């Protein structure tokens, strides 16, 4: 018979499992929000806000033909409620239109940027909750807690959750999609097909990269499930399963397409090629997919390890992950994923195999296919999977320390190693604060700009710190080499002169890392001098006395 104390203990545990993940996610959101005041807008934020407002205000989708609208709508809703509007004669440039909104609205720049960034927090909440429930279903509550804690203490996740960008939103919806994909592969019921279609539609409505991420993951999961069932089904059962999977996949695909089209709103547009009016989403979704294909086919200026290249490098993301991931997660996550995959194969359990298989598949795809090498943010979707491996390895080490057959020294060593790595991971929350976006691990050394720059180190985020430091030093005039999307004429800067590449001057000089590394060595002459100060993580301040 179960006593009252046991019942109360169990009910308390269930309450903790029910509300604990939400509390953890809210704490992560508060931590992210506490960094907003430090940073001005990063490069992509004005255009995302302008694109969202254009859809809300005017029912058209005019800026940047590579991204669907869901994340942008979330960012634009707060500013729109605060009175921000797309100007009637808005600029054809999304960056300029976004600047006009941020700097020339009735609400202040800080208010609008804060409200826009707040629109990203629901996606961080969703990411934490989807991670926790997916892992709990496969591995239990202890693993769910550990993996979610590892994920929410990852600087790259926190940094990109703190700005208006689409990478955390698509990561959150892809993790939800992975979970629902796995459930669907195990049993493609009507209910699960509908849930999968909704999740996939929302993910693709956020960023086009969700298409290959979810499609490849589904193929790998389905192949693994078929291999596990090989020889266990009769020919009649195989035919029945094919029909179930085919029907479920078709239903999910139709639902996903409908949701993607609906995300662009109810407006109809005339398409000359077919001579009729269609929903805006039919036209725009096609343009978004083609835009990404065109961008990838033609490349993007990129920097890695002292070199610049238009088409990138197959190993770019391997290097980025090596220096932008916490060392504890690297040491635990990769072996943990391998161990889970091996254990799943032996036990013939799909759920244990999925994280490692999906991680390897998506990493290989990004390395071999992507020619847009502008930051680890494009593979943020790998971090939830790596966090599962890290949680599994840490838990296995701790459980080994409790095994009665283990020797005392082995127990102590395993327990100490697990504790040190977990505490090291969590300590990063303090040591990296508030610069989660520009954080690098110890492998990068003292000069991470020699390895990566764009959006990993310098995304234009430190301009506010620069203006504060120049005011503190009472510097009367500067030469400025800065690449970002802020309106410099509206920032609190002293009089400045743009510093062109190869223009050797004296006096106070401001140089950001993006200008240094992506200007064809035009500012390398400054490397002969010691900067007075590194402002934030991405701007150097020099003083060269008159000759």
Show which residues each predicted segment covers.
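Membrane-interface transmembrane helices that cradle and orient dolichyl/undecaprenyl
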Residues: 177-193
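Membrane-proximal, lumen/periplasm-facing interface regions of secretory-pathway glyco-
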Residues: 286-289, 295-304, 417-468, 484-488
